[in-house]
């Protein structure tokens, strides 16, 4: 009788631990999905920096100052270059 009770309690404990671990893994996978756009944002930032720098260089060659309105979306024209604000 004691062995049966110990076996049942052990199985219940293992089941609870297994369910808890599964829930933690599911929560971690959801966090990872939310975190994915960070790498995409870095690529967008690099592209925007390149585009703004090129447009500022073109204006600079034409003996014009970099126009502040050229840089958009959190970028600002500074020292004839567009920089992230």
From Swiss-Prot:
Its main location: secreted. Keywords: Disulfide bond, Neurotoxin, Postsynaptic neurotoxin, Secreted, Signal, Toxin. Residues 23-48 form a propeptide. It is found in: Secreted. Residues 1-22 form the signal peptide. GO terms for molecular function: toxin activity. The keyword Lyase does not apply. Expressed by the venom gland. The keyword Transit peptide does not apply. One of its GO terms (cellular component) is host cell postsynaptic membrane. InterPro entries: Hwtx-2-like (IPR012625). Disulfide bonds join 52-66, 56-77, 71-82. Neurotoxin active on both insects and mammals. Monomer. Belongs to the neurotoxin 12 (Hwtx-2) family. 02 (Hwtx-2) subfamily. This is U4-theraphotoxin-Hhn1a. The lineage of its organism: Eukaryota, Metazoa, Ecdysozoa, Arthropoda, Chelicerata.
